Regions:
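Multi-pass membrane proteins that catalyze or facilitate reactions on polyprenyl-/lipid-phosphate substrates
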Residues: 1-157
């Protein structure tokens, strides 16, 4: 982890979002069910960018999908569908690794935490999909640029 890399990634990612929003192709895919295998592979490859600190996994996949001609709504939905297996696998792996260390009470607390976070995630994703059905990702792009620039000033200042 290097804060300068994170800061640069925020700025570069924000600029990439602005570029993709400005020059995106007219969407040819309006719903998730119509995303082709080829587009899904391209979106999955965009997800690899999230290995760079400061690059958002959802941001990379959403922008990758939009650049490949997917509507904002379908891109956002697909991005969050992609997250489900990754998050379940990571959670399962961590849980299996520490199952011997957790009491029954702690396991029930983990289950409650999982249920609450899943429910709140559904609410937030629904709100985001409602937002992107009416707006662009430009506000998110500017947020990334401003926040990244502030971090750059702090760490290089």
């Amino acid at each position: 982890f290097n804060p300068r890399v994170v800061a640069l990634s925020l700025v570069v990612g924000g600029i990439a979002m602005l570029v993709i929003e400005k020059w995106r192709p007219t969407p040819t895919t309006e719903i998730v069910d119509d995303i082709s295998a080829r587009a899904a592979l391209g979106i999955g490859l965009a997800q690899v960018l999230s290995l760079i600190p400061g690059v958002s996994r959802s941001g990379a996949t959403i922008m990758g999908a939009i650049a490949l001609g997917t509507s904002r709504v379908a891109a956002t939905e697909f991005s969050f569908f992609l997250a489900i297996p990754v998050m379940l696998a990571a959670t399962g792996y961590e849980l299996i690794g520490s199952i011997d260390l957790l009491s029954a009470e702690q396991l029930s607390m983990v289950a409650i935490g999982f249920a609450v976070s899943f429910g709140s995630a559904l609410i937030v994703v629904k709100a985001l999909i409602g937002f992107v059905s009416r707006h662009t990702f430009v506000p998110f792009a500017w947020y990334r640029i401003v926040f990244g620039a502030a971090l750059l000033a702090f760490y290089w200042g």
